């Protein structure tokens, strides 16, 4: 399944997205934040399933998971039954001067990891794994028009596509959302030398999207 997540609005402390499947709207994402804080209330409505996300980092910026691993920027995830889990960023110190960052999501007993690589001419790629098997890829363009962000999800089925919509909302809030700024007429192209981390590069399969049907 292929889903397109297109930002439609960016106000001072809020943002809105449409979720499209075959050019038809199948859901929305709404973000409500506040000045000077990464805390936000997020609602993902996709195929009629409503998932809410709230900042759950508490007073401490980081939490130690195990030796060499720390988690940051934790958000809770809840559905209509108040059942859900958490999503957060993990920093793994492989060596003294090598730290690898990725996203981890626990949802209803399932564990997802999302690994990012930057491609110099194409933008970002998030390779999404569940229990060690790749189930999706999220493409993030290297060009941003009018401060509005777009994401494309390539997933093996609808369930995994819905989970990736949650991951996209999280990526937006921690990487792209800037409270206090409105969308303005602009064009930005990001340039990067590309990812060098061997661990992250191993997770990226450039042929994965060719296996996905719309």
Labelled PLM ranges:
Residues 1-214:
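Intrinsically disordered, low-complexity proline/glycine-rich segments
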